Amino acid sequence: MITLFPSLIIQQQVNSLSTRHLVPRGEGEFDFVWTHFGFADDTPEMAQRRLRQANLFGPAGFVSADDGEVIEFSQDGFRQAKSGSTLCELGGTGTGGAEHMVTETLIRSMYAYWRKVMGV
């Protein structure tokens, strides 16, 4: 699983490639869009297999929690007044390097870039 941007995740699980894309629809509202890929020459059996594998994840998935619901809960928890902002310090505040692998500097860097791109 690779998060390319806060709103775009690409995942390859078993024999399936999927994207998850968050599409903002307004304040406090978004669509959570899944796209599953296959090949034009897949047999009907392979297409069915890919669909079954795709269903391992998501709202009715057997493997992971529904990220859409988790994201919604997170947004509710971080909601502020229009002029407010939220800072979640999970082991620091910076975006510099660390001498260990257990760090959240990469995710903080991604969101710092997102804020720059979005102008917030």
Predicted regions: what is each one?
Residues M1-V120:
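C-terminal catalytic domain of Rieske-type non-heme iron oxygenases
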